[in-house]
A protein has these predicted regions:
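Helix C-cap/helix->beta junction micro-motif
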Residues: 122-123, 293
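Short, charged, surface-exposed secondary-structure boundary motifs
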Residues: 80-86, 138, 155-161, 308-311
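Active-site PLP attachment segment
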Residues: 143-198
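PLP-dependent aminotransferase class I/II
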Residues: 6-8, 13, 27, 31, ...
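PLP-dependent aminotransferase-like
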Residues: 13-24, 29-30, 38-122, 134
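Short loop/helix-cap segments at secondary-structure boundaries that form the rim of catalytic
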Residues: 22-25, 62-68, 136-143, 194-199, ...
Length: 350
């Protein structure tokens, strides 16, 4: 039994779904890129020069996408909600955009969104909303532009979406070349064959994932989504994805409560969680132990050291948060296996 890690792709199971991801997003009329990074860099072109306010907890690829702008960070509460007092203290006429992030399926509270809307009217900045973690909870809240990396949710060799009421420059997008992501797709197929015992190719697919991720990190060009990845958006049932994730999350949350642990974020029952994030006493040691049992937990996010004094929570997250997998690949038996393993090492958890 295995949990976490890269998604696998079973070609025999592919079929177009009525409630597909493509259909779910269709009312937003998104532009589909090869990655969320490309979508974000395309969005950054439309922002006026000035200061961008970013939340302190953020992937370094977001920081890189805004490298042509002056960056400041605003703080978050321990439950990853916007610290509005801190954000408001950093607003002035030089701020061209506020980057709004929702975390792990939780959506920022309505009161915070209303404060941000009022501040936007006062100062005239744009809101760039990152819906990567929240897209299946709500497609959009108040963003002028919304950016989403879809490959975090299901087997997709590459794919990011850009949408929102301020989206323009569709002509420039249409001129971008299409990405060819056959190698990453091959890695996903190989993982499927390895997991079902058909082919002993563990080292090969891990190497493919590592090399394609390195290539994405180094990529500077912008691309449209590949034809194959666009097709895959029609093969994933968005409703079924959300139902399974909610079920797995609730089961794991209840089991963790018996150990005295609880999720970092307040995720509503009707929201769709990405992972179940928890504070742990010895994250690295626990993560290593879980790997011995073929449970692979992502790190959100390794700390990049940028403006470290302004980002105390980001440093703590990088050292002490563990993201537990609860995605649609797994059933009750998988979640119980995860919980039993956590119980074995609860001394590292609490």
């Amino acid at each position: 039994m295995e949990l976490g890690g890269e998604f696998y792709l079973d070609l025999n199971a592919l079929s177009e779904k009525h409630h597909s991801v493509e259909g779910y997003l269709s009312d937003e009329h998104p532009l589909y890129f090869d990655s969320g990074r490309s979508a974000l860099r395309f969005a950054a072109r439309s922002l006026r020069s000035g200061t961008i306010l970013l939340p302190e907890c953020i992937c370094d690829s977001v920081i890189t996408a805004f490298s042509g702008h002056t960056l400041r960070f605003y703080r978050l509460t321990p439950s990853l909600e916007v610290d509005m007092d801190d954000l408001l203290s950093k607003l002035n006429g030089e701020v061209s955009a506020v980057f709004l992030m929702h975390y792990f399926g939780a959506v920022q509270p309505r009161a915070i969104l209303e404060h941000l809307e009022a501040a936007r009217l006062q100062y005239g900045f744009s809101i760039v909303e990152d819906t990567t973690h929240s897209v299946f909870s709500v497609r959009r809240t108040i963003g002028d532009l919304c950016v989403c990396s879809l490959r975090k949710w299901f087997a997709l060799p590459g794919g990011g979406a850009l949408y929102g009421p301020a989206l323009a420059d569709r002509d420039s997008f249409s001129l971008l070349p299409r990405k060819t992501d056959a190698r990453r797709a091959c890695g996903m197929v190989c993982k499927s064959l390895f997991l079902d015992g058909t082919l002993d190719c563990n080292a090969e697919y891990l190497n493919i994932f590592r090399e394609t991720e390195d290539a994405l990190d180094a990529q500077t060009e912008l691309y449209q989504i590949s034809d194959f990845s666009r097709f895959l958006l029609r093969t994933v049932d968005a409703d079924a994805l959300a139902v399974r994730r909610r079920h797995n999350y609730a089961r794991l949350k209840d089991a963790l409560a018996q150990l005295g642990a609880s999720p970092i974020c307040r995720i509503a029952e009707d929201a769709c969680p990405l992972v179940l994030p928890v504070w742990v006493k010895d994250r690295d040691a626990l993560r290593r132990r879980l790997m011995e049992h073929r449970i692979y937990c992502a790190v959100h996010w390794p700390f990049d050291g940028v403006q470290a004094d302004e980002r105390p929570l980001a440093k703590k997250l990088a050292a002490q948060m563990l993201s537990l997998p609860i995605d649609q690949r797994y059933d009750t038996a998988h979640i119980d296996y995860l919980m039993d393993t956590l119980d074995t090492y609860k001394g590292l958890l609490l």
